[in-house]
Amino acid sequence: MKQQKVAFVCLHGSAKSLIAAQSFNRIAVQRNLPFRATTSGPEPDAQVAGNVVAGFKGRGIDVAQYKPTLVAADQLADADLIVSFACDAGRRFAPGKPEERWDECPAVSDDFDVAWGFITGRVEKLVARLAATRSLP
């Protein structure tokens, strides 16, 4: 089966979309699913914020060297599904591409643990839904 791609996009590509993509990829590998995720943002930070690095580290994941990337039209065109956090990535860069908006996600800067719980809970449901159909929209 062809590997299918989910593009997670948040404004800075360094917190919400990073949590989502890391979680999504971990679950997909654990369950041997043909899905992979990317992370990016239209205004990428130069580096991952300290509270995000610390939050990941507390969960045994090292993102200290991760460099946020600029969202690109070809990256989104290659995705089977776009999941955006409070930015119009799909509409701006890949009109007509299936997109889910998770705009109500709590700010990672306010409380990493609350945002982590929200995002990973949504990712679990997304993976379960995709696994049930074995394809993306």
Residue ranges and their predicted role:
Residues 76-78:
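Alpha-helix C-terminal capping/helix-to-coil transition sites in glycosyltransferase folds
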Residues 19-25, 86-93:
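Short, functional N-terminal and low-complexity linear motifs
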